[in-house]
Regions:
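A general structural detector for well-ordered alpha-helical segments in enzyme core domains, enriched
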Residues: 149-153, 202-209, 238, 242, ...
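Active-site-proximal beta-strand/loop segments in catalytic clefts of secreted hydrolases
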Residues: 164-167, 220-225, 272-277, 309-310
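Aromatic-rich carbohydrate-recognition surfaces in CAZymes
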Residues: 202-207, 211, 219, 235, ...
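Acidic, His- and aromatic-enriched active-site or binding-groove loops in soluble protein domains
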Residues: 107-109, 210, 235-255, 296
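Acidic (Asp/Glu)-rich catalytic clusters
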Residues: 153-155, 207-214, 247, 259-266
Length: 310
């Protein structure tokens, strides 16, 4: 999903937010992507062909850990390079396999930089698909994956409650794509902002952030208004399953999934809002939505408090 873009790109194109270099070709491949619609593909005959992303911010002395998923053929393996001014770090990565396989790496920055670049390359001949590129400083890993400066800024606001998903994002959000192993999560095309969310921040991360900040979570459910081809009953079921994932015991159907994701104890989310800005439904239409969702959601957990839009 990291390489997806809207509107659809041609096959012979560089992935969004990356630039290509070298004599080979960079393509968008939809044959067998890792978990979205497309992956980046490097097709090279000689020399060095790769993808680069910049600018990245590095702090001297900070350790960074990353990973990427690859499949294909490259007898000479892959190269990973980080450049920051005069400092250059190069790592050799193993040759890809026919099936998707994760490659991990780490490095300690030897210089401060606001314009560092990350390069992923095939040295010589190869045909390699790449997806799910990730890079995170240890400082963020220590907070559970959150940017320390951003977490500190939010903490300074002392929010008693945090609402999520928020805005138009909530109206199309499918929560099941945002749980489980990061590299297995589905993509979320946010067409209104011409963007793609890789779902690295999902329900478990939201609850974790709220607990770090001492804020009460408020979850907004998707009522399916923008998906007329799907029966509303499917969205009601999805909302109830979300409640069970958050609040059900570890031996319930979705409580087992939560426990398998490392959280055996129920979250006890009390506040649930039925949809976001519902201007397209009209007053009577939204009343009908609430009348359909509310009884089912209360049946899933009678202790919850439901909120409706004004």
């Amino acid at each position: 999903p990291l390489f997806e873009g809207l509107p659809p790109l041609s096959r012979d194109a560089t992935p969004r937010h990356w630039r290509s270099y070298g004599s080979g070709k960079i393509l968008l491949d939809d044959g067998r992507p890792k978990n979205g619609r497309i992956a980046a593909r490097i097709a090279a005959e000689s020399g060095e062909t790769g993808l680069a992303q910049a600018p990245l911010c590095l702090r001297k002395g900070e350790t960074y850990r990353g990973s990427l998923w690859t499949r294909g053929t490259a007898p000479g393996g892959l190269l990973l390079r980080v450049t920051a001014g005069d400092w250059v770090m190069t790592r050799a990565l193993p040759a890809p396999a026919p099936e998707w396989r994760e490659a991990r790496f780490e490095f300690t920055a030897k210089a401060d930089a606001g314009d560092a670049a990350l390069q992923i390359a095939v040295p010589g001949q190869g045909d390699v698909c790449i997806d799910q590129v990730s890079l995170m400083p240890d400082a963020a890993a220590a907070t559970g994956g959150f940017r320390p400066d951003l977490l500190e800024a939010i903490a300074g606001l002392r929010p008693p409650l945090i609402r999520w998903p928020g805005g138009c994002y909530a109206e199309r959000y499918r929560w099941k794509d945002g749980i489980g192993p990061q590299a297995a999560r589905g993509r979320f095309p946010v067409s209104i902002w011409d963007d793609i969310d890789t779902n690295s921040y999902g329900t478990d991360e939201f609850i974790a952030m709220c607990r770090k900040l001492g804020a009460e979570p408020l979850i907004v459910i998707n009522a399916g208004r923008h998906d007329p081809g799907t029966p509303r009953a499917d969205y009601i079921k999805e909302a109830c399953e979300w409640i069970e994932y958050c609040n059900g015991p570890a031996d319930s159907a979705w409580g087992k999934v939560r426990a398998a994701n490392g959280h055996p104890e129920p979250y006890g989310v009390r506040l649930w809002e039925i949809d976001n800005e519902t201007w397209s439904a009209g007053v009577e239409g939204y009343i009908a939505i609430v009348k359909e969702f509310a009884p089912a959601m209360r049946a899933a957990d009678p202790s919850i408090v439901l909120l409706a839009c004004g």
